[in-house]
């Protein structure tokens, strides 16, 4: 027998009361986005399950994709069949025969939500267990810790049989907690910050600053590839490329070297906040980790934050670098992040950046710039690209390989 579908059990959604169906529908949409590379798949949701019909598609890549989607508590490959006792008997016998090995123990666990069905749960357990013994007389039943628990669900629309439960990613469906702008440089930390924000249901749009010719097409492709990795956890992501060359050249020419990083970050924050307001976001997310680099001391954060009253979420702020690296490896962004392309934060980095910049000094140096004009020109020049889980071709990988 081939699996008919993957049955998805919802995570924290069970606690969402009147908003439950809104959360479930969002999860359904996210699953459809993530499974877009598999055109035969269909997705249907009810109040306590989401059903991913395979329609002949190999179940293993579908399981691997679904395991990453936030809002999924657990999933099981299942056999779906008509609510017929003879069909159930035959299916249970076939499944257990295919799984049998010497010494195997099993139990039947039936759940009946369709109370109009002809047998109750106890009667089904007895009948189906007896059917297994008919074809496998040497198999042993074990109620407490069996090798195989064959779960049979009798629901209104059909019967479902499964024996494997796979842990999902948990968390909340992406998009159920509002929208935020993720400042993604291309390093190790910001993709991890994005992953953690996605886990709590935040719909992120990626903001990436590009300064050609100082930053290369490879750096841009790298940032887009990191974004594509993040789409596996909740579906499509808008990638916003910000032209930053003019601002960086202005800062380089007019500001003291020690304040280059502080002023650069202040402009980035202003621009990100302007984009957030334009695109109706609620928060800004970044990958700052306290004390990791000069721009991430409390004094630096305070001087940089002063340009906005928008909440700044820093998911990795208390994590050690090794912890961040381990998480980056786990979510498959680390190998991309360490590709040797310079980003906007490194091309004009001073040898001795100020670790305790004074806000008054930063504001004094910024009097040398047309702040509003620079920000407005950057925001008006953004390029927005929708990044999807589906890789249409290998252009990104080929470009990176050619530039390395």
Curated annotation (Swiss-Prot):
Keyword entries, A-Z: ATP-binding, Cytoplasm, Nucleotide-binding, RNA-binding, Thiamine biosynthesis, Transferase, tRNA-binding
BP term (GO), one: tRNA 4-thiouridine biosynthesis
CDD domains assigned: PPase_ThiI (cd01712), THUMP_ThiI (cd11716)
Molecular functions (GO terms): ATP binding; CCA tRNA nucleotidyltransferase activity; tRNA binding; tRNA-uracil-4 sulfurtransferase activity
Oxidoreductase as UniProt keyword: no
GO CC terms of this entry: cytosol
Signal peptide location: none
Catalysed reactions listed for this entry: [ThiI sulfur-carrier protein]-S-sulfanyl-L-cysteine + a uridine in tRNA + 2 reduced [2Fe-2S]-[ferredoxin] + ATP + H(+) = [ThiI sulfur-carrier protein]-L-cysteine + a 4-thiouridine in tRNA + 2 oxidized [2Fe-2S]-[ferredoxin] + AMP + diphosphate; [ThiS sulfur-carrier protein]-C-terminal Gly-Gly-AMP + S-sulfanyl-L-cysteinyl-[cysteine desulfurase] + AH2 = [ThiS sulfur-carrier protein]-C-terminal-Gly-aminoethanethioate + L-cysteinyl-[cysteine desulfurase] + A + AMP + 2 H(+)
Domain THUMP residues, every copy: 60-165
Subcellular location: Cytoplasm
Pathway of action: Cofactor biosynthesis; thiamine diphosphate biosynthesis
EC code(s) of this entry: 2.8.1.4
Domain of life of the native organism: Bacteria
Listed InterPro entries: Rossmann-like_a/b/a_fold, ThiI_AANH, ThiI_fer, ThiI_N, THUMP_dom, THUMP_ThiI, tRNA_STrfase, tRNA_sulfurtransferase_ThiI
Enzyme class, first EC level, given as a word: transferase
Residues that coordinate or bind ATP: 183-184, 208-209, 265, 287, 296
Role, per record: Catalyzes the ATP-dependent transfer of a sulfur to tRNA to produce 4-thiouridine in position 8 of tRNAs, which functions as a near-UV photosensor. Also catalyzes the transfer of sulfur to the sulfur carrier protein ThiS, forming ThiS-thiocarboxylate. This is a step in the synthesis of thiazole, in the thiamine biosynthesis pathway. The sulfur is donated as persulfide by IscS.
Family of the protein in this entry: Belongs to the ThiI family.
The name this protein goes by in its record: Probable tRNA sulfurtransferase
Organism lineage: Bacteria, Bacillati, Bacillota, Bacilli, Lactobacillales
This protein's encoding gene: thiI
């Amino acid at each position: 027998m081939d699996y008919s579908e993957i049955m998805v059990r919802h995570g924290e959604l069970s606690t969402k009361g009147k908003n439950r169906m809104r959360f479930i529908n969002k999860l359904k949409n996210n699953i459809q986005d993530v499974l877009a590379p598999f055109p035969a798949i269909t997705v249907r949701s009810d109040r306590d399950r989401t059903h991913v019909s395979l329609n002949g598609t190999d179940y293993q890549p579908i399981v691997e994709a679904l395991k990453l989607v936030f809002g999924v508590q657990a999933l099981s490959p299942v056999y779906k069949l008509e609510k017929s006792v003879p069909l159930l008997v035959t299916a249970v016998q076939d499944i257990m025969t295919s799984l049998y090995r010497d010494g195997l123990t099993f139990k039947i666990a039936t759940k009946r939500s369709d109370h109009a069905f002809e047998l109750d749960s106890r009667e089904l357990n007895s009948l189906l267990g007896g059917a297994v013994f008919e074809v496998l007389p040497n198999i042993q039943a074990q109620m407490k810790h069996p090798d195989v628990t064959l779960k049979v669900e009798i629901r209104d629309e059909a019967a479902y049989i499964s024996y494997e439960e796979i842990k999902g990613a948990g968390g909340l469906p992406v998009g159920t907690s509002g929208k935020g702008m993720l400042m993604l440089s291309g390093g190790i930390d910001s993709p991890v910050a994005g992953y953690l924000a996605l886990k709590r249901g935040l719909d992120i749009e990626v903001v990436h600053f590009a300064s050609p010719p100082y930053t290369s097409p490879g750096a841009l492709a790298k940032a887009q590839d990191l974004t594509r990795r993040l789409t596996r956890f909740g579906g499509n992501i808008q990638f916003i490329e910000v032209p930053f060359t003019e601002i960086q050249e202005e800062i380089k020419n007019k500001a003291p070297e020690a304040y280059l990083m502080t002023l650069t970050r202040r402009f980035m924050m202003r621009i990100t906040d302007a984009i957030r307001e334009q695109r109706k976001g609620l928060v800004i997310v970044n990958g700052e980790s306290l004390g990791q680099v000069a721009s991430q001391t409390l004094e630096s954060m305070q001087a940089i934050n002063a340009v906005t009253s928008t909440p700044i979420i820093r998911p990795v702020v208390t994590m050690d670098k090794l912890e961040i690296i381990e998480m980056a490896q786990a979510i498959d962004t680390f190998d991309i992040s360490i590709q040797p392309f310079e980003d906007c934060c490194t091309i004009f980095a001073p040898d001795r950046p100020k670790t305790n910049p004074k806000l008054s000094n930063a504001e004094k140096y910024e009097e040398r710039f047309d702040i509003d004009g620079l920000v407005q020109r950057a925001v008006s020049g953004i390029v927005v690209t929708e990044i999807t889980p589906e890789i249409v071709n290998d252009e990104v990988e080929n470009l990176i390989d050619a530039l390395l």
